[in-house]
Design a protein with these regions (language model features):
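Thioredoxin-like thiol-disulfide oxidoreductase module
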Residues: 117-137, 168-169
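C-terminal motif of bacterial Sec signal peptides marking the signal peptidase cleavage site
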Residues: 13-14
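N-terminal leader/targeting and pre-domain segments
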Residues: 21-77
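Non-catalytic, surface beta->alpha helical segment in thiol-disulfide oxidoreductase systems
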Residues: 143-179
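Thiol-based oxidoreductase modules, predominantly thioredoxin-like and allied folds used
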Residues: 83-88, 111-125
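Local sequence-structure signature of Cys/Sec-based thiol-disulfide redox active-site neighborhoods
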Residues: 75-106
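Sec-dependent signal peptide recognition
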Residues: 2-7
Length: 181
């Protein structure tokens, strides 16, 4: 019953589809046309205007659970890689991706083992990654070990990014918010 209520809540609060182009007013004297990152992109793209207005602030303000991060550090290794499918327009992506990268930095997990893929407001891109990776909501963090998917975090964390990743890596039975649907 709790899962059904959670799913209904998530459904009504999930990423809305805003206009694909809007204005970012973080710069004082001029407006910047906002264009979403679509397809493959690099982490450094998030630190450039106009994305830096939310990425840097959310990265800096994220309070890392160091105790859990230390446990993850013992489990994460070169056999692990991660795909992050997100939308720069999506509030859940804006909230969760910077904290994810703060954790990856703490773990000294190489950016080369994290692949970033952007989707548009319809949760699509020209490469059809939404179909290839069976994306239902974003952000989606897909964890691979030796190239095989082991689990994924979909849209929202169940406990926290650290605790959810720990459960994925230690095999203690992590189920994302959409598991079984």
């Amino acid at each position: 019953m709790k899962k059904i209520i959670l799913i209904i809540l998530i459904f009504f609060t999930s990423c809305k589809n805003p206009n694909t182009k809007n204005k970012d007013h973080s710069e004082s004297d001029k407006d910047i046309e906002y264009v979403d990152l679509i397809g493959d992109f690099e982490r450094k793209d998030l630190t450039k205007s106009p994305y830096d207005s939310w990425y840097i602030e959310n990265y800096d303000n994220y309070e890392l659970d160091v105790e859990t991060a230390k446990k993850i550090k013992k489990l994460i290794n070169r056999k692990i890689s991660i795909k992050v499918i997100m939308g720069t327009w999506c509030s859940d992506s804006r909230d969760n991706v910077p904290g994810f990268f703060k954790l990856m930095d703490y773990l000294k997990f190489s950016d080369r083992r994290v692949e970033l893929i952007g989707l548009d407001v319809d949760k699509k891109n020209p490469n059809e990654d939404e179909l290839k990776y069976d994306i239902i909501n974003i952000p989606t963090f897909i964890f691979y070990k030796n190239g095989e998917e082991i689990n994924r975090i979909v849209e929202l964390t169940i406990e926290s990014i650290e605790k959810d990743i720990l459960k994925i890596l230690d095999g203690s039975g992590y189920e994302n918010a959409y598991y079984g649907f």
